[in-house]
Amino acid sequence: MKFVDEATIKVDAGDGGNGTVSFWREKFVAKGGPDGGDGGDGGDVYLEADENLNTLIDYRFNRFYDAERGKNGGGTNSTGRRGEDITLKVPVGTRAIDIDTGEKVAELMAHGMKIMVAKGGWHGLGNTRFKSSVNRAPRQKTMGTKGEVRELRLELLLLADVGMLGLPNAGKSTFIRAVSAAKPKVADYPFTTLIPSLGVVRARGNKSFVIADIPGLIEGAAEGAGLGVRFLKHLERCRVLLHVIDILPIDGSDPVQNALTIIDELERYSEKVAGKPRWLLFNKTDLLLEAEADEKIAEILEALAWEGAHFKIAAVSRTGTQEVCNELSDFMDTLPKEIMTDEEKAALKVDFMWDDYHKDAMSGKNVVTEDGDDDDDWDDEEDDGHVIYARD
């Protein structure tokens, strides 16, 4: 199946049903009084994470999703039926962004997690609600509110423990092929990898972790150059970043400048991502004599003023790759589990202030008065039943 990690959809929650103006009429009961019921609430729209899905491709073909409208109220104080909700299944790791406001509406990080993204309209009030000692036959009602309409950008963030980054042709795909069963395309030209790939890595002690191969970055990626931020986002949930540096680039470029380009793009994209633990992997060391490779690596480390973890590998021959995996596994055991901040939790909440509508309604705002005969014109000879005043 084609990997699709972005889609744009429009969700339309159901409108609330209108309240009804109705009066009970019964033989020998001249003035039965109001019995208009409330409408039903409109249906809501939810996103739910499903571990059986791994792409957003379905939402490329169907972009519009509507919840059901609430039914209008009826006579005999009958409340209208609530509109049916709709639930859209998405892969685990999906987040939803409101295109108009840029607000993060939802981020679904676990199977079964369910978040409302559009609230249905509130029900209108029937005329029974307006009965009082001075208004015995009210013809007032309120209309249901409109359901929320949102245009959402769905983004699928790969859930990996380790993310690989580097310039095109640095050897990221070769490394992931060497340490896992993943088989991303490998060739001797830039941008061979056009979509992210995931691989499961086995480490010592019967441990395992997931590694993500991210398409190569170029200068300006944080602003969308090349494959841009579309794939930088996949690093947000990684616990460790592996920065692959080609010590002998085929185009003759400077490895130090290449490394600085990646570092700069990370910092421009997100301070949080740039602050994640990052290890350097010096690749293609088999193209030089061991002493030459060591000297080259030392020069790069000095130029970068790098004091963090670094490894010398030759991914094509798998030299040093298993050592990296074992060290990664041990290192991640020491990392604390990520805990969402209060600010991040607040960003996931969707607040709807619908109670104000009913307060306004009962105070005289948003009220519709139906036309009808005078209150006293009740005919005792009418058949049993009730009269509903309705306006189309």
Curated annotation (Swiss-Prot):
Q: Where in the cell is it found?
A: Cytoplasm
Instruction: Indicate which residues the UniProt annotation says bind Mg(2+).
Output: S173, T193
Region Disordered, annotated ranges? 364-392
Question: What residues bind GTP, as annotated?
Answer: 166-173, 191-195, 213-216, 283-286, 314-316
UniProt xrefs under Pfam families: GTP1_OBG (PF01018), MMR_HSR1 (PF01926)
Determine the domain of life of the protein's source: Bacteria
User: Major location, coarse class?
Assistant: cytoplasm
Can the keyword Metal-binding be found in this entry's annotation? yes
Q: Which HAMAP family match?
A: GTPase_Obg (MF_01454)
Q: How does it assemble?
A: Monomer.
Q: This protein is called what?
A: GTPase Obg
Tell me the organism's taxonomic lineage.
Answer: Bacteria, Pseudomonadati, Pseudomonadota, Gammaproteobacteria, Vibrionales
Q: Gene behind this chain?
A: obg
